A protein has these predicted regions:
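Conserved beta-strand signature within the Rossmann-like core of class I S-adenosyl-L-methionine
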Residues: 174-183
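Conserved Class I S-adenosyl-L-methionine
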Residues: 218-272
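N-terminal auxiliary segments of SAM/dcSAM-dependent transferases
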Residues: 1-46
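A short acidic, Gly/Pro-enriched loop at the edge of an enzyme's catalytic core
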Residues: 142-153
Length: 272
């Protein structure tokens, strides 16, 4: 198991009954779906994406709309992984990309391990149901339940970037793969919602402690040909919660929507 005890950072052993236990006696039950909850009790309440957002994203991604990004991530992971690689998807959501990466790794005959975590319990439940071969946990990017240098390849796909934790868990020479939206991503969607649609801001690619190996762009036009697909895309974005009702109605009354899809995939190496 790639995960460590979130309380003492000690290694975890999995008992026959599924519990994960450290040498100090801290114990974590495995949920029936197969994941562990490593959010500490003092972080109670609801965290991350709610069930509605998770279901919308799952429905949208299952159409294959973001498959070019998924294939790029899989190819990049395979390029740098070995049989001994410990691969971690930080902020993996409902596990769409994590699942495809694990399947590609398996098809290649590799013994590399693929794990993921997300702060949303609803999201991790669906990820665990989708692929029982994944090691999954509820956890925060700002307090990863992983030992120092315990990750060979770390992915961050539209997740919060906690740079100190990223550097802590990534071994020297390890790879960090990060996907972000480019400037025109979903501009067609925003053009329907807002009178003055805005472009995304892309920050400087330089990150402390990491050497940039590659910067690859993915760009295409996506046509959504049903109200259900348009609704799924909208509901999985933050725009669903900060858009006036009249604009929502205007978007959701459309039968067809064309929008720009733009991503940037950065690959970094942890400096020694």
């Amino acid at each position: 198991m790639i995960f460590c005890c979130p309380k003492c950072k000690g290694s975890l052993s999995v008992l026959p009954d599924g519990r994960a236990v450290c040498k100090d006696g801290h114990s974590y039950d495995r949920a029936k779906e197969g994941y562990y909850n490593f959010l500490l009790k003092n972080t109670g309440g609801t965290h991350g994406d709610n069930k509605e957002m998770v279901l919308a994203r799952r429905a949208f991604l299952e159409t294959g709309a973001y498959l070019p990004l998924a294939e790029k991530l899989c190819d990049t992971v395979l390029r740098y992984s070995t049989d001994a690689s410990r691969i971690l998807d930080g902020g993996c959501g409902e596990g769409y990309y994590t699942d495809l990466i694990e399947r590609r790794i398996s098809e290649a005959g590799s013994c590399a391990s693929v794990s993921g975590f997300d702060i949303s319990r609803d999201a991790i439940k669906y990820a665990a149901k989708k692929n029982r071969s994944l090691s999954l946990a509820v956890a925060s990017s700002y307090d990863m339940p992983v030992g120092d240098g315990g990750v060979d390849i770390l992915l961050n796909v539209f997740a919060p970037l906690a740079i100190e934790e990223t550097l802590r868990v990534l071994r020297q020479g390890g790879k960090f793969i990060m996907a972000i939206p480019d400037v025109n991503h979903l501009f067609g969607l925003k053009s329907v919602l807002y009178e003055r649609p805005y472009k995304n801001t892309v920050e400087d690619s330089a990150l402390p402690g990491l050497k940039l190996l590659s910067e690859e762009k993915i760009s295409y036009t996506l046509t959504l040909d049903s109200r259900e697909k348009i609704s799924s895309l909208f509901m999985m974005t933050p725009y669903a919660y900060r858009t006036p009702e009249s604009a929502k109605e205007r978007l959701l009354s459309l039968d067809v929507l064309k929008t720009e899809i733009e991503f940037i995939v950065f690959t970094y190496e942890r400096e020694k």
